[in-house]
A protein has these predicted regions:
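Intrinsically disordered, low-complexity segments enriched in small/polar residues
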Residues: 3, 8, 75, 97-100, ...
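Enriched for short, Lys/Arg-rich terminal
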Residues: 110-139
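Short, well-ordered helical secondary-structure segments
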Residues: 21, 47, 86, 107-109
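Short beta-strand segments that buttress and anchor functional surface loops
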Residues: 98-111
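Generic secondary-structure microfeatures
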Residues: 73, 103, 124-126
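N-terminal targeting/trafficking signals and adjacent low-complexity tails
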Residues: 2-41
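Compact soluble domain cores
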Residues: 29-100
Length: 139
């Protein structure tokens, strides 16, 4: 028997098919609450190895991910699903397309500024004190 732990605040259901299972069909976490938890540079954990790798490949640190999260809007929700961290812990996550934040970035290789779209998947921990990011990469 496989033992796993649900670490997210949402836990009305549990994953049964090894992850990727869709949940609810509406956001589980309020964007204003996510922003409040991460305000001031606190309350964020890059929860998976993939997320740490995503941030590193973007040349981002903790504060850059928080800045992206602080720019999220309610209308950017895509879906909700179960995700694991590869160490028997599961989180019910909301996926958001952070394109409406209108992040314009300078791309030195082409000497041009462009609007860049990002995808972020996140959850709030059981205590309601931490936003855990599962994915954070360009769309």
């Amino acid at each position: 028997m496989v033992t796993f732990y649900v670490v997210s605040e949402y836990s009305l259901t549990t994953p049964t098919n090894g992850g990727g299972e869709k949940i609810l069909g509406r956001p589980m976490y309020d964007v204003a609450r996510i922003k409040a938890i991460t305000q001031g540079g606190k309350g964020l954990q890059l929860w998976t190895r993939d997320c740490v790798k995503d941030a590193r490949e973007l040349g981002w640190g903790h504060d850059d991910v928080i800045q992206l999260i602080q720019g999220l809007r309610h209308d950017e929700y895509i879906d909700s699903e179960w995700c694991d961290n590869g160490r028997d812990a599961w989180a019910a996550c909301d996926a958001c397309d952070a394109c409406a934040t209108h992040r314009v970035e300078r791309i030195e290789s082409i000497n041009k500024s462009m609007r860049i779209e990002y995808f972020v998947k996140l959850a709030i921990n059981k205590l309601g004190t931490m936003v855990m990011t599962i994915s954070c990469h360009t769309s």
